């Protein structure tokens, strides 16, 4: 049974760091200068999440593969619980730039991996995923590696729609040459206007009508290739998430905005009180299970 003192939703996003080896103008994650969660705190968080018997954890950042302790952390997190029940399903959200040798150490402990490709048009993709020129090829190579050699790991491909890629997003799956390499889920994201996304919304954000038009075209592509399509809309963001940030602050989404509600270790009573109404348990579960279904 879960520890009754830890009244957390079933699905948690663990943002371990802000640091990244890309500088994407639409990023909604922590600012790059935010200090990374140290190893001791990261393992304390994992211990707490396991005691709470959360059912799924998305590990993100920043770029989590930059952390030297990541392999040990996901191994610990994914272990069966002391009761004998399965550990939480672990999702790694990564930009895909880590060397294959690094990924081979991490992949055995994952249920899902989430990677991004923004456009079939290379120039559009490079304007969105800035910092490393061959990024798209690296992601497609990782996709092939996972689908051919790590069959237990499911793959979600993500595409964020902005003014930069509105004409090329719908053709992303055309870059995947063989059906056997296709992702299990392709998720289309409306740009979240948080952090860097908020800084750059005036020149990046598209209207709801433009976004829905892109979604319609993506749906046709996904149906043609037999890939499950999921869609994130900003209107559904509130109540769907509980984030743990690098400083161990718990973050919820109220009216589309991030709100910090306390330290995970020091403010548990306050967090429990604030979570009531701030996280919709049905929406939280539906968001995770829709994006990362139990296939």
Regions of interest found by a model, annotated:
Residues 62-64, 95-97, 118-120, 160-162, ...:
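Active-site beta-loop-alpha junctions enriched in small/polar residues
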Residues 49, 77, 105-106, 146, ...:
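Generic structural signal for hydrophobic
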Residues 23, 53, 86, 109, ...:
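Short loop/turn motifs at secondary-structure junctions
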